[in-house]
């Protein structure tokens, strides 16, 4: 059965390497997972005063509906100053409120990321995974995904040109699909 994954990328940059990686994962997962990319750049900074009658601003309600409708979640994070970008934390905050109405609870989830440095996004992912567990997501622990990004391994359309990398992405998406299937 094909499952839907809400994908949140923690970078707003138009040429984001993490968007490139997320699109490559989507291509590799075709037929097993459908990636529904969630726009988080238009979310206001979290402010409890913006809730009215249990509803948040329109971008918040759109994001929450996408996540609620998905079978699982994939957070694709860059690493800023050895931690998670504020835009991604902001999305997590909006999704966890109002109290008792979190869209994250019991959601099968994965976490991955890419950077140009040798350790990929290891520090950010450690922080993010702790937050994901705190929010009640059921986080896939293995395989881990810390990618040192090499632009020469991707075509302009996002297709992975390196066979070894394509295999790694397939292993990851196979594991994510199995994780979601077990929990749905």
Q: What does each of the following model-derived ranges do?
A:
Residues 8-10, 38, 112:
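Short hydrophobic segments within beta-strands
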Residues 55-136:
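Helix-loop-strand module that forms the ligand-binding subsite of alpha/beta enzymes
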Residues 138-184:
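Glycine-rich phosphate/pyrophosphate-binding loop and the adjoining helix
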Residues 36-45, 144-151:
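Short connector loops at secondary-structure junctions
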Residues 2-32:
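N-terminal beta1-alpha1 ligand-phosphate binding loop
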Residues 30-36, 137-138:
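A generic structural motif
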């Amino acid at each position: 059965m094909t499952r839907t994954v809400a994908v949140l990328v923690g970078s707003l940059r138009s040429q984001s390497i993490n968007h490139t990686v997320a699109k490559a994962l989507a291509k590799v997962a075709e037929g097993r997972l459908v990636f529904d990319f969630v726009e988080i750049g238009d979310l206001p900074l979290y402010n409890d005063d913006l809730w009215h009658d249990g509803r948040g601003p329109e971008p918040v309600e759109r994001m929450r509906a996408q996540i609620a409708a998905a079978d699982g979640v994939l957070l694709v994070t860059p690493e800023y100053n050895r931690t998670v970008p504020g835009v991604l934390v902001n999305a997590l905050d909006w999704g966890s409120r109002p109290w008792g109405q979190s869209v994250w609870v019991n959601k099968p989830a994965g976490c991955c990321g890419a950077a140009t440095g040798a350790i990929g996004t290891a520090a950010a992912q450690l922080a993010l995974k702790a937050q994901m567990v705190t929010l009640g997501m059921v986080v896939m622990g293995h395989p881990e995904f810390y990618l040192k990004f090499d632009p020469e391994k991707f075509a302009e359309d996002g297709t992975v040109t390196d066979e070894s990398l394509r295999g790694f992405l397939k292993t990851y998406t196979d594991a994510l699909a199995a994780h979601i299937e077990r929990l749905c």
